[in-house]
């Protein structure tokens, strides 16, 4: 091999190595995801599966098979098991969409081969083994956390005032009160769990930031979305954008599904 050929080969080898390093640390482009026919929706803390009720009809209208997980909200491991059971019922390519706390669930169980894309809606998105609480502490504390009311049994929920003013402030008051009534109570162990893997490193990822979020700091949402190389949209919404901006949320999930 002459000097010119050797230099060309060295350049190509270096480029390939660099590309490989990048591929290992960032998700593939969102537009590379295959077409999905299923969607699994996962709710967060202070909520239940019915919070997706306004999103679901838009997805079904596009021919998607939709399932909404009901999380026990006792431990991360148990919630992940519930999500896995739902994924096991899917018959092929599936988009996994998560709101709020359940972004941690999607990060963990999204490695399932059926999952073709991840959609985070104002959601937590830690790296593998990362202490999310420590990450969130780097940003100003959002107001909703002051409204957490814990019972003698160790389970907690948001007060009605916090729910209406800091969790769902752009939802009609009557609807917000109804949603507050059905919110799941969380155990004092729920937020102690950590992921062991990060599905977003290998799966096309989408993120909807809630610009008016008073439950998760919007700048933290932007940081996580950027770190995941997610295709990001910003919504003029509260934390509960899956209700107040249901059409926009559905459109993002439909885009992730490729239908």
Task: Mark where each language-model region is.
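Gly/Ala-rich beta-loop-alpha elbow adjacent to hydrolase catalytic centers
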Residues: 97-98, 102, 106
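Conserved serine/cysteine hydrolase catalytic core
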Residues: 187-228, 233-237, 242
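N-terminal export signals
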Residues: 5-26
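Flexible "cap/lid" loop of the alpha/beta hydrolase fold
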Residues: 114-115, 119-151
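Post-His helix in hydrolase/transferase enzymes
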Residues: 243-255
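C-terminal segment of N-terminal export signals and the immediately downstream linker at the start
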Residues: 1, 20-36
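Conserved alpha/beta-hydrolase catalytic His-Asp/Glu region
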Residues: 154-199
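Conserved HGGG/HGGXW glycine-rich cap/lid loop of the alpha/beta-hydrolase fold
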Residues: 35-76
């Amino acid at each position: 091999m002459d000097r010119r050929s050797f230099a060309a080969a060295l350049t190509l080898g270096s480029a390939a190595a660099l590309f490989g390093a990048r591929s290992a640390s960032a998700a593939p482009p969102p537009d590379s995801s295959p077409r999905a026919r299923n969607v699994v929706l996962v709710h967060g803390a202070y909520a239940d599966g019915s919070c997706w009720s306004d999103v679901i009809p838009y997805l079904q209208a596009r021919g998607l098979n939709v399932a909404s997980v009901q999380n026990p909200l006792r431990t991360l491991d148990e919630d992940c098991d519930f999500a896995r059971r739902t994924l096991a019922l899917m018959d092929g390519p599936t988009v996994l969409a998560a709101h709020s706390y359940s972004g941690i669930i999607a990060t963990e169980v999204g490695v399932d081969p059926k999952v073709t894309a991840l959609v985070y809606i104002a959601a937590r998105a830690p790296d593998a083994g990362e202490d999310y609480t420590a990450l969130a502490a780097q940003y100003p504390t959002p107001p909703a956390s002051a409204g957490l009311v814990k019972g003698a049994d160790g389970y907690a929920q948001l007060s009605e005032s916090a729910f209406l003013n800091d969790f769902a402030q752009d939802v009609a008051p009557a609807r917000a009160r109804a949603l507050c009534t059905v919110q799941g109570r969380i155990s004092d162990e729920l937020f102690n769990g950590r992921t062991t893997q990060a599905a977003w490193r290998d799966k096309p990822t989408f993120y909807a930031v809630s610009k008016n979020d008073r439950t998760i700091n919007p700048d933290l949402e932007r940081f996580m979305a950027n770190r995941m190389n997610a295709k990001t949209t910003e919504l003029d919404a509260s934390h509960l954008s899956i209700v107040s901006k249901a059409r926009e949320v559905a459109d993002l999930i439909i885009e992730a599904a490729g239908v």
